Amino acid sequence: MRKSHYDASIDYLITIKYSFKGESIMTEMQQYVEDVLAIIQRRDPEQTEFQNAAREVLTSLVPMLEKEPKYKQHHILERIIEPERVIIFRVPWEDDNGVFHVNRGYRVQANSAIGPYKGGLRFHKSVNLSILKFLAFEQIFKNALTGLPIGGGKGGSDFDPKGKSDREVMHFCQSFMTELCRHIGPNIDVPAGDIGVGAREIGFLYGQYKRIQDAFDAGVLTGKGIDYGGSFARTEATGYGLLYFVKDMLDNKNIDIKGKTVIVSGSGNVAIYAIEKAQALGAKVVTCSDSSGYIYDANGIDVATVKDIKEVRRGRIKEYIETHPDAEYHENSRDMWKIPAFIALPCATQGEIDLESAKILVQNGVKAIGEGANMPSTLDAMAYFQEHGVLFAPAKAANAGGVAVSALEMAQNSERLSWPFEKVDATLKDIMRNIFEESRDNAAKYGVPDNYVAGANITAFMKVADVMIEQGLV
């Protein structure tokens, strides 16, 4: 089989090969990784998203595995790729016209070695088991990077809240939680929001949980409203954390973020607050987008207008030009990557930057990428950025701010206290700096300096794997 651009790049970037009689042979640990990836392919051949996520993580671990054979001896890779539990259930609900519908609900409880399962709920028509296994697998490592005691999980449904009334969304959320409540708890599994699950949905979900359990267990969900156990800075956390990581990455190379042009995709929480923090740090953000198209504003995006469109009116991004006639609206969001910039922040969805887009970004002068969405760059694109010296902040490290503040929300719920915004934000900044420094240092330690993909994966894997060894074969 012909190797993909990504596979060839991985060979070049992070693996060690030896030549014997003119042929290239794999090291023991390379073969170990390939054998484990073959297990996934054999068991779940249709789960391409999960396969890609596993390949991205496991291949990047090879330099560390060469020096730390204990992980192979304890069969950690075989164990960590298999979720501890996968729950699938039906979700019946009734729309405003009295018509009955049935959607499918999921919860993937991936790993609880260092704490209760933690990860968001996604409501979107594209949701399937492969996507949720990929997200749950990523969540294991993202959560471990925070240094907080939280395991990895993910859930959701193929229900799409778009176009539904508040009443219909409430009916669905109540039905969804009626089953999910059997499998979660403050010390078991703590879901949060994700695509399609915002403050409204979290409120409906928590209300139904409280009704069924007859208890005010605020710590069972995060992303709640401030008045019933939520945390200040939770809404801003992922976007702010992304910029804290990117700034540290640039500072490490003596590059000042001030005055740099930034292109941002998306217009949800991550994108909005990434724009807000980038502007606060002195950068100039010129784009944002939604599923209908993108805005280019050469004067700099007016984040207050975007907030009004998306958070208040729940409108489309093209409405921006109604109050900013000098801005441009274009329907093909992929063309956004053609705009010259120094920094690109993909904050929309997975796979939005492919190899072709990566080439365009590099050609147009982008020197740093910060992933705000979950795995928005394809494997080919990631390899291309690495090959061309682009500073690349991978999602599991760069967007860990959201789950970090979710864990801080859990801590506040346990204390029955509410921390001020400034304390939460300062703690978030410290957590993101620690993630950056550990990723940087481990990348250098294991022979792949400036490769934050490998550095983050190695750091997170070792945190989880060491505990799995201590806890035995469970």
Q: What is the predicted function of each stretch?
A:
Residues K3-I25:
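Short, Lys/Arg-enriched N-terminal segments with co-localized hydrophobic residues
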Residues T27-A53, M249, V362-V474:
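Adenosine-phosphate binding glycine-rich loop
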Residues T48-Q51, K67-H74, G147, I184-G193, ...:
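Flexible, glycine/charged-enriched surface loops at secondary-structure junctions
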Residues K70-H101:
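Structured beta-strand/loop patches that form or line metal/cofactor-binding pockets in enzymes
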Residues H124, N143-K258:
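Glycine/serine-rich phosphate-binding loop and adjoining beta1-alpha1 elements at the start
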Residues G230-K338:
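Glycine-rich phosphate/diphosphate-binding loop of Rossmann-like nucleotide-binding domains
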Residues G293-F392, A397:
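Rossmann-like adenosine-cofactor binding region
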